[in-house]
Amino acid sequence: MPITDLPQTLPATSPDAASDVASGAALGAAIQRFAPPLPLAVAFSGGADSTALLLACAERWPGQVVAIHVHHGLQSAADAFVLQCVKTCAQHAVPLKICRVDARHAPGQSPEDAARQLRYATLIKAANEPWPAQGGVPMPAVRSLALAQHADDQVETLLLALSRGAGVAGLAAMPAQWSRAGLAWYRPLLDLP
């Protein structure tokens, strides 16, 4: 979609709002401990948490970080988040892929579960597709993917699982690292509030 087709209003988030994720020192320490195989793709919603993660990673590994935005179209502000992602990535010279998906859920499936499954499948597909050359240099294949979930997200997920009567497996904590579809996946902000 051409940028001109997007709405000109932005959701109430900006790179400055990324300070809500954690203090700069805590974020910096988390990124210093984070050592993914490069190149790295960041799942980029355009919200404060993923903006903080993307900018910190792009600063630490210039030219080795790309962003993937999955547009579910489930929120009225979805197109505005696309615009936020486009602007942020352009300002920081981070390659961006915008993936539009149909997040309708199947009968008996929760909308959240359908959106999550589709989002993960889309992230895998986008990460594995070729990326445009940067400055005439071909971009190597993405080797790892980072998600901006943090401790508050983990608590929210646990409470949601409890409210749905989840068993022991459903109450397990979010992993900070795992492998899936040939990619190393990370949640480097999981220890941050």
Where are these regions (language model features)?
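Core alpha/beta nucleotide-donor-binding catalytic domains of modification enzymes
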Residues: 2-193
